[in-house]
A protein has these predicted regions:
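Membrane-water interface segments at transmembrane-helix boundaries in multipass membrane proteins
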Residues: 76, 84, 132-191, 195
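Generic alpha-helical transmembrane segments of integral inner-membrane proteins
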Residues: 9-26, 102, 106-114, 118, ...
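Alpha-helical transmembrane segments of integral membrane proteins
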Residues: 2-3, 90-127, 143, 167-233
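Hydrophobic alpha-helical transmembrane segments of membrane transport/permease proteins
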Residues: 16-63, 79-81, 158-176
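Short amphipathic alpha-helical coupling elements at transmembrane boundaries
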Residues: 46-50, 64, 68, 88, ...
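An internal, D/E-rich "acidic patch" concept
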Residues: 55-113
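Transmembrane alpha-helical segments of polytopic membrane transport and secretion proteins
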Residues: 1-12, 40
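Transmembrane helix-loop junction
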Residues: 28, 37, 117-121, 152, ...
C-alpha cells in the first residue's frame, strides 16, 4: 500500500511540474511584455522589466518562480492590481469563489436527485425522456456557454439578475454563476440517481413494502431513495 501511495504521489508531483513548466513556457512565448498596455516608452519598460526580474534568463526565472510558488509566494500582479500581492488577491476573492462552488454543488445535487427520482418513478411516462434530454444537454453544453445564455436572456434581456458581481447585492449576484456551474453535476447525479432508483424499485423488499399497504410516497422516501443514494454518497 505504501509503495502504491508513494508511486501515485510521485506521478502527481511530476504531472504538476510538467503542467507548471508548460504554462510558464506558454507565457514566455507570448509576444510583448506585461507592460505593453501601459503605453510606456521602451526605456520605462526596460526599467520595469529589470525591477521585476523579467530581464533574467528563462531558466533563472523559472527556478525562482518554482521555489517561490512552493513557499506560497506567487509574486505581485502586473496588471490586475499594481504591485499587489497575488496571494492577497486570491485571499480577497476566495470567500466568494468557495461560496459559489459550494452552492453550485448543493443546487446540482438537490436538483439532480429530484430529477433522477422523478424519472425513475415515472419511467413509463414522458417525464423520463425529458429528464434524459436535460441530462444529455447538461453534459454536452459547456458551463460557460450556458452561463452566456443566462447572462444574455436572464440578466440582459429580462433584467432579472445582475451580470457583474456587486458586493452590496452578493446573494443575487451569485445566482447566475451557481446555476451555470451546477449543470454538469446536476446532469450526472440525475442520470446516476435514475439508474439506481430503477434498480432499487425492482427489488423484492420494495415490492414487499408496497404489498403491506404502505403508501408509494412513503416507500420511495423511506426505502427506495435512501438505498439508491448510498452509492452516490
Amino acid at each position: 500500500m505504501k509503495k502504491y501511495v508513494c508511486k501515485r504521489v510521485l506521478i502527481s508531483a511530476f504531472t504538476l511540474f510538467v503542467i507548471v513548466l508548460i504554462m510558464f513556457l506558454l507565457m514566455e512565448l507570448m509576444p510583448g511584455t506585461p507592460f505593453n498596455d501601459e503605453k510606456l516608452e521602451p526605456q520605462q519598460i526596460e526599467v520595469l522589466s529589470r525591477k521585476y526580474g523579467l530581464d533574467q534568463p528563462v531558466l533563472t526565472r523559472f527556478w525562482k518562480y518554482l521555489t517561490n510558488t512552493l513557499r506560497g509566494d506567487f509574486g505581485v500582479s502586473y496588471v490586475l492590481a499594481k504591485n499587489m500581492s497575488i496571494t492577497d488577491l486570491l485571499a480577497n476573492r476566495f470567500p466568494v469563489s468557495i461560496r459559489i462552488a459550494l452552492l453550485s454543488m448543493l443546487i446540482g445535487t438537490v436538483v439532480g436527485i429530484i430529477l433522477g427520482t422523478l424519472a425513475a418513478v415515472f419511467h413509463d411516462s414522458i417525464l423520463d425522456p425529458i429528464v434524459s434530454v436535460i441530462s444529455m444537454l447538461g453534459n454536452s453544453i459547456p458551463s460557460y456557454v450556458f452561463a452566456l445564455g443566462l447572462m444574455y436572456f436572464v440578466a440582459y434581456k429580462a433584467g432579472l439578475l445582475p451580470i457583474l458581481y456587486n458586493a452590496k447585492d452578493s446573494l443575487r449576484s451569485i445566482i447566475l454563476p451557481c446555476l451555470a456551474l451546477s449543470t454538469t453535476a446536476m446532469s450526472n447525479i440525475a442520470r446516476f440517481t435514475r439508474t439506481q432508483m430503477i434498480e432499487v424499485l425492482g427489488s423484492d423488499y420494495i415490492l414487499l413494502a408496497e404489498s403491506e399497504g404502505n403508501k408509494k410516497v412513503r416507500v420511495i422516501m423511506r426505502h427506495a431513495l435512501r438505498n439508491s443514494l448510498i452509492p452516490l454518497m
